[in-house]
Design a protein with these regions (language model features):
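Cleavable N-terminal export/targeting peptides
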Residues: 1-31
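Outer-membrane beta-barrel domain signature
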Residues: 27, 54-60, 95-99, 142-146, ...
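A structural signal for short, well-ordered beta-strand segments
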Residues: 40, 126-128, 173
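Outer-membrane beta-barrel proteins
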Residues: 45-51, 90-96, 133-139, 179-185, ...
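Gram-negative (and chloroplast) outer-membrane scaffold detector with strong preference
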Residues: 70-141, 145-151, 161-167, 204-217
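Outer-membrane beta-barrel porins/channels
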Residues: 154-156
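Predominantly the C-terminal beta-signal and adjacent terminal strand-loop region
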Residues: 158-217
Length: 217
């Protein structure tokens, strides 16, 4: 191979690199994002598995604390996918007993960054996942535990203000839809599987309002 051909190949490589380098340097977003939020959650229907069925008690237990942790990967400026954990907890008591309700959602998310500027980001994602319900309750001094697992769909919207390229503060709204098909109860030494008929008392649908931090890298 003569020197002229070698020089031509080297020039071609140099030209190719000079064309591609600006394209990569124009990426003005970080590919990875971790975010953590906490706030308020409310169920649209009466929570299932409670030890008291009065309307006021059911509405009290339908409201509680919510929190979530999210990871998102952005291969393109507006396209994003990742995973999410979302939790909910509420508790109450009455003369005959008490309830401590937990609802956990673990699933995948896919969506879009509808707005992405130097300081602002709006991200909307949705996806399916598993829903775990637990009620650590007590009736007449005896422990009663209820467990259930089902499938749900969670839609998540976040508005983030970026303090710097790596850190932001955000507001979030989450809507989770899910219904129970059956549950397992353990009370007074007996274990029972209860099949549910799909009325409002089996609906776990809720909305969360949260605030937190996002870290980009």
């Amino acid at each position: 191979m003569n020197q002229t051909l070698i020089k031509a190949i080297l020039l071609l490589i140099a030209f190719t690199l000079s064309c591609h380098t600006p394209l990569f340097s124009q990426r003005d977003f970080e590919r990875h994002e971790f975010s953590f939020h906490a706030g308020y959650g409310v169920m649209f229907h009466h929570p299932p598995t409670l030890t008291l069925s009065t309307h006021s008690y059911q509405r009290t237990l339908a409201q509680g604390e919510s929190w979530d942790g999210q990871y998102n990967f952005r291969p393109l400026k507006r396209f994003v996918f990742g995973g999410i954990y979302s939790g909910f907890s509420s508790k109450g008591s009455h003369p005959e007993g008490k309830d401590h309700l937990w609802v956990h959602f673990i699933g995948t998310q896919i969506g879009m960054c509808n707005v992405n500027t130097k300081h602002w980001q709006i991200r909307v994602t949705t996806g399916p996942g598993g829903v775990i319900l637990r009620n650590n309750s007590e009736v007449f001094g005896k422990t009663r535990k209820v467990k259930a697992f089902t499938i749900g769909l969670l839609t998540n919207a976040n508005l983030t203000y970026k303090l710097n390229p790596n850190l932001g503060v955000s507001l979030g709204v989450q809507y989770m839809y899910s219904e129970l098909l059956r549950m397992r109860t353990h009370y007074h030494g007996e274990r029972v599987i209860v099949k549910l008929d799909g009325n409002n008392d089996t609906n776990l649908t809720r909305i969360n309002f949260t605030t937190g931090l996002s870290y980009y890298f």
